Amino acid sequence: DKTPLCHLPEFKEEPHAYVKLWKHHGAEEEAKLMNDVAVARGEEWLPTYGGKISSEWMYPKIYETLRHAPEVYDAADRFMEAGDWIIWQMTGEETRSACCAGYKAYYHHEKGYPSKDFFKAVDPGMENIVADKLDAPIKGVGEKAGHLTASMAREMGLMEGIPVATCII
């Protein structure tokens, strides 16, 4: 129902249930572990990102949650970038911005996300991360993600039904 877990009583005191913005560097260890696996496996997407996974990107933060608060990881239906979540709230349509997916989640428009095998090598609990907790239509920058819902139109003082584009970093 799009409710962030931090809004639920059982997760109110759990830091990993809250938003982890780009500047969050708590997942340095997870980024290093993921990078070591990517290098050892010769992941072809890694050089596209400068040969090093950053703790500021999506998967190290998700992995940090899995390692330190597995109950949060298990309870989360979705993990997403803040911009994609805002667009979801505005339109009621879950989409992913190609900009965010490409930059923060190693998505390639022809090859997709990194393989299940990569994620399984990182941690068996991550094997199905894409299919289970990320999968949604990916839309290009400036592409229509949906239309503004009536409730959001009232809240924002805009017209219901106007087109809403994907987010951009």
Regions found by a protein language model. Give the residues of each.
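Glycine-rich phosphate-binding/catalytic subdomain of phosphoryl-transfer
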Residues: 1-169
